[in-house]
């Protein structure tokens, strides 16, 4: 898939089971006021005005459903496009599958920047997406939105014994979308033999593991991750306020 030079492509890994939500279906396909989380996430990215194309990775048996829903939702939206691909066994592999649809950084048509966004952060406001892209265009090669912590954090061992209490002032709760210069993210995933040996919970961790510098920008409370039934209830209340 070729895109115009200088563009921003967002990748949405949405193939996970989401067992903590206990909905009986993949989490990204839970509905929030009649629209699935993945639909809300994809449309939110495109409507931000700074994302040119979205590649969403879903379970193989959900491809047709996702294509139909997005085609209906974007039918009257000029210049807004999404590609649906089969995801992998975990988040990292789903991102790999999505990246494989894009031209390599050295090829004509490669995007300038890539965002990676959780489908479960379905209420992420446009202002946060813009903030991440603005930081990329300002010269940072890896950008994550994050919020200060309000809770005290304890490090514990396997038996639940407290090992220490890190200073909260230097800690942040990281959100998505996370943004990267295309070449940096591409190289991180291409150096792939190590991917199965380390549990990377986000893409910035992978970049850090390879020595990359990651810039934090202000996050947004509305970009919370819908992981449990309580989160889903909160999201519904926010939409209906």
UniProtKB/Swiss-Prot annotation:
GO terms for molecular function: 2-C-methyl-D-erythritol 4-phosphate cytidylyltransferase activity. It catalyses: 2-C-methyl-D-erythritol 4-phosphate + CTP + H(+) = 4-CDP-2-C-methyl-D-erythritol + diphosphate. PROSITE patterns: ISPD (PS01295). It is an enzyme of class 2 (transferase). The record marks 20, 27 as: Transition state stabilizer. It holds the Pfam family IspD. The record marks 168, 225 as: Positions MEP for the nucleophilic attack. GO terms for biological process: isopentenyl diphosphate biosynthetic process, methylerythritol 4-phosphate pathway. Gene3D superfamilies: Spore Coat Polysaccharide Biosynthesis Protein SpsA, Chain A (3.90.550.10). Its EC number is 2.7.7.60. Keywords: Isoprene biosynthesis, Nucleotidyltransferase, Transferase. Pathway: Isoprenoid biosynthesis; isopentenyl diphosphate biosynthesis via DXP pathway; isopentenyl diphosphate from 1-deoxy-D-xylulose 5-phosphate: step 2/6. Catalyzes the formation of 4-diphosphocytidyl-2-C-methyl-D-erythritol from CTP and 2-C-methyl-D-erythritol 4-phosphate (MEP). Belongs to the IspD/TarI cytidylyltransferase family. IspD subfamily. This is 2-C-methyl-D-erythritol 4-phosphate cytidylyltransferase. The gene is ispD.
